[in-house]
Amino acid sequence: MHHNERFLLLVLSLLPTLAMAENNLLPVPLTALEKQGLELKGEFTLKPDFKGYVMEYDGQGTTVFLSPDKKHAFVGNLVDSEGNNLSTPWIEKYVYAPMAREMWQKLEKSRWIQDGKDNAPQKVYVFFDPYCPYCTEFWHKARPWVDAGKVQLRLIPVAILRPDSNLKAAAIMMSKDPVKTLHDYESSHWKTRLDKPDPVPADITAALQANLLLMEKLGSNATPAIYYLSPEGRLQQQLGLPPDDDTMNTIMGGKP
């Protein structure tokens, strides 16, 4: 191979690296924002000469725009002359939609008990403690949707309310038919006797701890902690007290 050919191959091999280096050079204000903890999630162009950036901090999205000399950044929403928020769809695309997909996948991988048909169009995750009266009330309110095949509840057990919550949760999880056991327990308002293991097996303890960590990561500190996807695919949260009728219709994707 001639010297010129070797040089040409070397230059060609470096081109992707050089391109990546050039693309990674951010305007100074964006770099300063990154040092403050903001993370760049995406960029967009509204006009040929008007570019915006989407950044995220602690789960919250915002848009950033640069001055013409690129020495200053303006952080906040962009509103047009009619009051329309032009930032919202871009924040949704680059921050909240990916975040919803990620959290939904984590919910799917958690240890849950299915209550409802496989082909139910609406899936609703519910973190519950066996001693939570509001969880029981929500379970009863959800029956019309579940029984009609419109909703599948995915009930995620946690142990936070009483010292033996873990024993009751483990009894439900370890039973031959967790769905029936939970159904009998909730429908009897906790009067059904549970075969509580003592001690709780290590794998069940690990599952309960993982469920609690996920619940905390989602920002929940009360049960029931209810999660579902809006028609737009955004993760929605409902905590604590059982929802009113209108909110129930929203969670369940419609009327029963």
What is each of the regions a protein language model found here?
Residues P16-A21:
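N-terminal signal peptide c-region/cleavage motif recognized by signal peptidases
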Residues W104-Q122:
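A short beta-strand-turn-helix
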Residues E22, L26-G52, G59-F74, T192-P256:
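C-terminal cap of thioredoxin/glutaredoxin-like
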Residues M1-L8:
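Bacterial N-terminal signal peptides that target proteins for export
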Residues A120-P130, T136-V200, E216-N221, L241-P243, ...:
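Structural alpha/beta surface segment adjacent to cysteine/selenocysteine redox centers
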Residues Y96-Q105:
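Long, charged amphipathic helices and adjacent flexible linkers at domain junctions
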Residues K70-A97:
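A short, surface-exposed interaction/processing loop segment used at functional sites
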